[in-house]
A protein has these predicted regions:
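C-terminal and inter-domain tail/linker signature
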Residues: 1-137
């Protein structure tokens, strides 16, 4: 049986791919809640998280790299790096092909070996700053 740390790593690595968004269903509880102040809706349920990630993954080719994972009781905390490339329209901005790399943290709460709640905090503004086209000379 995988540890909660292994499940957390799988969650971070698999939910970055369009064809693996179903990972939410297998890894999360039905009453899952996600908190992310960088997103348009700061707190969303499972369907909302999938909808937001679908929009983000249409605009960005992403790769999450968990840098560290610490587990205690029903919680797993991770420090991660997100790398991405702007490949599709996002919030009115056409795809630029530009890349970004930012850091973040997440704390996941498990119930019966499934993720019930996630608190994300990552440098979304830093990512958008890196995606701005260079200023005209």
């Amino acid at each position: 049986m995988p540890s909660t740390k292994a499940l957390a790593r799988r969650f971070l690595e698999e939910t970055e791919h369009h064809d693996r968004l179903a990972a939410y269903d297998g890894l999360c509880t039905e009453d899952y809640r996600e908190h992310d102040p960088a997103m348009p809706e700061e707190t969303v349920d499972l369907a909302g998280a999938r909808r937001i990630y679908q929009e983000v993954l249409t605009a960005f080719a992403l790769r999450h790299t968990p840098e560290s994972l610490i587990a205690e009781d029903d919680l797993v905390a991770s420090r991660f790096t997100v790398r991405g490339r702007h490949v599709g329209a996002y919030q009115g901005f056409p795809p630029s092909g530009l890349t970004f790399e930012v850091g973040g943290q997440v704390t996941l709460r498990f119930v019966d070996r499934r993720i019930a709640e996630a608190w994300f905090n990552w440098d979304f503004d830093g990512a958008l700053e890196q995606l701005r086209p260079p200023a005209a000379a």
